[in-house]
């Protein structure tokens, strides 16, 4: 499984990348707003830090404007992945862009039907939103499972990018189902390493080691 970090915070991205935990980055208009920076400027900086795909989203809803904005975004760096909403215009733009060799991340996916159409349009990634579905009382993981089955049935190459991930359990469940990628906020990715028994065991080992009076280096 690949880990993408869902943020436009360059400091956080750099820290996680230095740990070897980042395979890519996802951003959206809300995260750009939170960063307080120009979208082109911050996206270019992120692309220079991370070797993997960096998703940057168009802010248009109609095909022609989507294509214009996508052209600007695509020029930022070679590892750019253009992010489009799963709409009819978005699907049309996806088909056109992937035909030109661009990577495309279809976002705001809330149904298996949407994921099927995205794969037909040649999307590189499909981003089903787990947490937002959970908020409506629907189990978001069931959607991941449905998409996995459909993609496996027809050998689609579109990768399932589990998004709107809020907890470490979301990550575990997505991995068990077979999502190709999880994108999560920095805090969630860092929390994956945490376990109270690890902390307790380390404390015991260090205390016992101190009693030996030895040094390794």
Curated annotation (Swiss-Prot):
Keywords: Cytoplasm, Pentose shunt, Schiff base, Transferase. It holds the Pfam family TAL_FSA. GO terms for biological process: carbohydrate metabolic process; pentose-phosphate shunt. The keyword DNA damage does not apply. InterPro entries: Aldolase_TIM, TAL/FSA, Transaldolase_3B, Transaldolase_3B/F6P_aldolase, Transaldolase_AS, TSA/FSA_arc/bac. It is found in: Cytoplasm. GO terms for cellular component: cytoplasm. Its EC number is 2.2.1.2. It catalyses: D-sedoheptulose 7-phosphate + D-glyceraldehyde 3-phosphate = D-erythrose 4-phosphate + beta-D-fructose 6-phosphate. One of its GO terms (molecular function) is aldehyde-lyase activity. NCBIfam families: fsa_talC_mipB (TIGR00875). PANTHER family: FRUCTOSE-6-PHOSPHATE ALDOLASE 1-RELATED, TRANSALDOLASE. Belongs to the transaldolase family. Type 3B subfamily. HAMAP family: Transaldolase_3b (MF_00494). This is Probable transaldolase. It comes from Brucella canis (strain ATCC 23365 / NCTC 10854 / RM-666). The lineage of its organism: Bacteria, Pseudomonadati, Pseudomonadota, Alphaproteobacteria, Hyphomicrobiales.
